[in-house]
């Protein structure tokens, strides 16, 4: 192989692999992320269990918004929940509203990291699943610095995760309008 062929091969490889700086763009290799089908295993991976039918000592709701730039990412229905299988992990969803339910027979601290572990989607200080770029986190309308995994799921809390391209200014969306049954 001559030098010109090597140069062309290297140029093609760089073009195909994307020679932008790491994290320079948001990737779309994941959303929409499906709900897990193995409810028991996913719950156990998050330190949760099936509490279907148990008397509840704690019942709170947190709203989760995920944005890829300005595009909403749907939080699936029935993460950690199935009426047919009579399964309800302490943290679960019922629909695609973004409302995350915490229903537990004991009062304890549950976190956003546990919810993402149960969902099977990676969450860290610089990414949500396959979305990479700049992660901005708001909790109840206030900017939060640090690892979003540690955010506690408390009643009527609003968590917003926005992944943008480097240098793009993230925008806090309007607050979630809680349905009246949650007041």
Model-derived features: positions:
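Bacterial N-terminal signal peptides that target proteins for export
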Residues: 1-7
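C-terminal motif of bacterial Sec signal peptides marking the signal peptidase cleavage site
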Residues: 15-18
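Ubiquitin-like/PB1-type beta-grasp interaction modules and other compact soluble beta-rich domains
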Residues: 20-183
């Amino acid at each position: 192989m001559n030098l010109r062929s090597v140069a062309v091969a290297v140029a093609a490889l760089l073009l195909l692999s994307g020679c932008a700086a790491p994290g320079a763009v948001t990737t779309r290799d994941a959303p929409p992320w499906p709900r897990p089908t193995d409810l028991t295993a996913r719950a156990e991976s998050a330190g949760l269990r099936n509490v279907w039918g148990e008397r509840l000592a704690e019942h709170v709701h947190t709203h989760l918004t995920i944005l890829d730039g300005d595009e909403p990412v749907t939080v699936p229905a029935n993460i950690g929940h199935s009426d047919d299988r009579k399964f309800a992990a302490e943290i679960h969803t019922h629909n695609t509203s973004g409302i995350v339910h915490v229903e537990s027979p004991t009062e304890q601290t549950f976190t956003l990291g546990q919810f993402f572990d149960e969902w099977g989607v990676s969450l860290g200080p610089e990414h949500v699943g396959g979305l990479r770029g700049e992660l901005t986190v708001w909790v109840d309308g206030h900017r939060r610095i640090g690892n979003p995994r540690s955010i506690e799921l408390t009643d009527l809390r609003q968590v917003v995760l926005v992944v943008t391209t480097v240098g793009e200014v993230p925008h806090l969306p309007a607050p979630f309008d809680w349905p009246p049954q949650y007041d």
